């Protein structure tokens, strides 16, 4: 494809060279550049692509995209300046891979909590309906039975290059639908620009990622961007910012909720240790459904999934038959079966709100104690640590504060931040920095009717310590300890 074709939808200045050259690939990593590639210089948190332009040229880049002045000389390489390299990357990748999102029923799910669960519920129901569906999110990307098994990705919403590659791969393998998590970071960094979403979904909003966004207002506004990129938005009307999304979004809206007069509602919930059943109501039709996943948030996640399928044109009565196909999601309310019949749940909850909801649900499941093992990630929103400590301290009978992914912080410093929240409500807790030892301690003090909640990492099979990923899997540790 000609560089001129790839640049057709953005404003640019040709600094030098020829835009009628053939482009055979795109990269924003200078080390991955090959002959006749275009290298897009992106400024990240730790590295600036403009510092690697010479390396990209030496590796064969036919063209380089920049968004700031570049004064060094590079021979035989076209140089193009744009306003924003991240926007340019999304534009170029969309065209280079022939606008893959337009060939799919693409559903984007945003919100603080529930994104991973909702995309898998939507996938489970669409697959049961006979529609091959790919997923992209925290657990990786996957297209079941189509030679694309779970492939890990980082971050949750891939960079525009990888995203368009994955979508094109889905299409080549026969997918008709794709469901993806759309993070606030991805929206802010233009990773999903030029994506053609059929449906956008909003789950909820609570404090998270303030290290990146600065304020909850900025965080919220990034989420709202999705509803200017799709024809219809499926939103949780019970959430505090639902009205603002409707006011600021430019799409049509379909609402769901329990507490409000939404388009799709639920009532008469019956919560059991391993399931929830409830009546679902839509346009005068009511039906009882049961899902083999417990908790109030399961009701909301199921409603979000049902609403998404309705907006994709599937009729309500057909959808009701698909609800039973919903399966538990890895690391989300995951019960660890064990020979000693200990009540142990592993969950990804890592915000004050998600921990609160998890522990409220756990209280409904037991007459015994709730013992919670948890920590907070390093190099992330420090302001939520005390709030998480307070939530766990109030709703647990005993807490063990430990390490999560400390990254470049000292685990002891993170634990102290959590501890300050616990001290405000005089909770019972102890501190064990080593996560394996903390889990071991939790199991040791667990009595017959107690529940042990191991929170924060869920599906993750690693700890990030400094710049290194060290293998660590909560479920493996539990199984080893219980032997």
From Swiss-Prot:
Q: Which UniProt keywords apply?
A: ATP-binding, Cell cycle, Cell division, Cell shape, Cell wall biogenesis/degradation, Cytoplasm, Ligase, Magnesium, Nucleotide-binding, Peptidoglycan synthesis
GO cellular component, as recorded? cytoplasm
Role of this protein: Catalyzes the addition of meso-diaminopimelic acid to the nucleotide precursor UDP-N-acetylmuramoyl-L-alanyl-D-glutamate (UMAG) in the biosynthesis of bacterial cell-wall peptidoglycan.
SUPFAM superfamilies membership: MurD-like peptide ligases, catalytic domain, MurD-like peptide ligases, peptide-binding domain, MurE/MurF N-terminal domain
Q: Which cofactors are reported in the record for this sequence? A: Mg(2+)
Q: Give the taxonomic lineage as stored in the record.
A: Bacteria, Bacillati, Bacillota, Clostridia, Eubacteriales
Intracellular or extracellular location(s):
Cytoplasm
Q: What class of enzyme is it?
A: ligase
Q: Where is the signal peptide?
A: none
Name the pathway.
Cell wall biogenesis; peptidoglycan biosynthesis
Stored Pfam families: Mur_ligase (PF01225), Mur_ligase_C (PF02875), Mur_ligase_M (PF08245)
PTM-bearing positions, type N6-carboxylysine? 223
Write down what this protein is called. Answer: UDP-N-acetylmuramoyl-L-alanyl-D-glutamate--2,6-diaminopimelate ligase 2
Q: Motif Meso-diaminopimelate recognition motif: where?
A: 404-407
Give the EC number(s) under which this enzyme is classified: 6.3.2.13
Is Chaperone included in the keywords of this UniProt record? no
Q: Which residues bind ATP?
A: 111-117
Q: Which domain of life is it from?
A: Bacteria
Q: Which residues bind UDP-N-acetyl-alpha-D-muramoyl-L-alanyl-D-glutamate?
A: 30, 156-157, 183, 191
Q: Which residues bind meso-2,6-diaminopimelate?
A: 380, 404-407, 456, 460
Q: What GO molecular-function term can you cite, just one?
A: ATP binding
Q: Which family does it belong to?
A: Belongs to the MurCDEF family. MurE subfamily.
Task: Output the Gene3D superfamilies linked to this UniProt entry.
Answer: Mur ligase, C-terminal domain, Mur-like, catalytic domain, MurE/MurF, N-terminal domain
Q: How is it modified after translation?
A: Carboxylation is probably crucial for Mg(2+) binding and, consequently, for the gamma-phosphate positioning of ATP.
The scientific name of the source species is Clostridium acetobutylicum (strain ATCC 824 / DSM 792 / JCM 1419 / IAM 19013 / LMG 5710 / NBRC 13948 / NRRL B-527 / VKM B-1787 / 2291 / W)
């Amino acid at each position: 494809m000609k560089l001129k074709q790839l640049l057709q939808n953005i404003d640019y200045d040709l600094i030098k060279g020829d835009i009628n050259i053939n482009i055979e690939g795109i990269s924003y990593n200078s080390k991955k550049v090959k002959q006749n590639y275009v290298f897009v210089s992106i400024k990240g948190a730790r590295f600036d692509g403009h510092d690697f332009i010479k390396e990209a040229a030496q590796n064969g880049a036919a063209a380089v995209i920049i968004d700031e002045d570049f004064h060094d000389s590079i021979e035989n390489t076209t140089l193009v300046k744009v306003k924003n390299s991240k926007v340019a990357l999304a534009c170029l990748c969309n065209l280079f891979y022939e606008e893959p999102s337009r060939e799919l029923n693409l559903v984007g799910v945003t919100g603080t909590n529930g994104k991973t669960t909702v995309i898998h519920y939507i996938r489970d129901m669409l697959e049961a309906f006979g529609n091959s569906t790919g997923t992209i999110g925290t657990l990786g990307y996957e297209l079941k039975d189509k030679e694309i098994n779970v492939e890990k990705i980082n971050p949750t919403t891939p960079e525009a290059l990888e995203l368009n590659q994955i979508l094109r791969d889905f299409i080549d393998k026969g997918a008709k639908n794709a469901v993806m998590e759309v993070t606030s970071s991805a929206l802010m960094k233009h990773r999903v620009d030029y994506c053609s979403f059929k449906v956008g979904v909003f789950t909820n909003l609570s404090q998270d990622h303030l290290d990146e966004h600065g304020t909850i207002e900025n965080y919220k506004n990034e989420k709202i961007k999705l509803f200017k990129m799709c024809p219809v938005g499926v939103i949780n009307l019970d959430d505090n910012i639902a009205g603002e999304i409707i006011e600021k979004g430019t799409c049509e809206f379909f609402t769901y909720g329990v507490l409000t007069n939404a388009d799709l509602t639920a009532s008469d919930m019956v919560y059991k240790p391993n399931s929830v059943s409830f009546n679902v109501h839509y346009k005068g039709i009511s039906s009882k459904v049961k899902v083999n996943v417990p908790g109030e948030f399961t009701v909301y996640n199921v409603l979000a999934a049902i609403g998404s399928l309705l907006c994709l044109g599937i009729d309500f009565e057909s959808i009701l038959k698909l609800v039973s196909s919903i399966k538990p999601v890895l690391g989300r309310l995951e019960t660890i079966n064990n020979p000693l019949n200990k009540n142990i749940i592993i969950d990804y909850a890592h915000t004050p709100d998600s921990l609160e909801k998890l522990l409220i649900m756990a209280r409904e499941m037991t007459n015994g104690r709730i013992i919670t093992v948890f920590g907070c990630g390093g190099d992330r929103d420090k302001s939520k640590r005390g709030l998480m400590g307070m939530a766990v301290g109030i709703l647990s009978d005993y807490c063990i504060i430990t390490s999560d992914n400390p990254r470049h912080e000292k685990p002891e410093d993170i634990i102290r931040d959590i501890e300050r929240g616990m001290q405000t409500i005089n909770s019972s807790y102890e501190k064990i920095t080593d996560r394996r030892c903390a889990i071991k301690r939790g199991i040791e003090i667990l009595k017959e009717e107690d529940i042990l909640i191991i929170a924060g990492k869920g599906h993750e099979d690693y700890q990030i310590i400094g710049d290194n990923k060290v293998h660590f899997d909560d479920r493996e540790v539990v199984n080893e300890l219980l032997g």
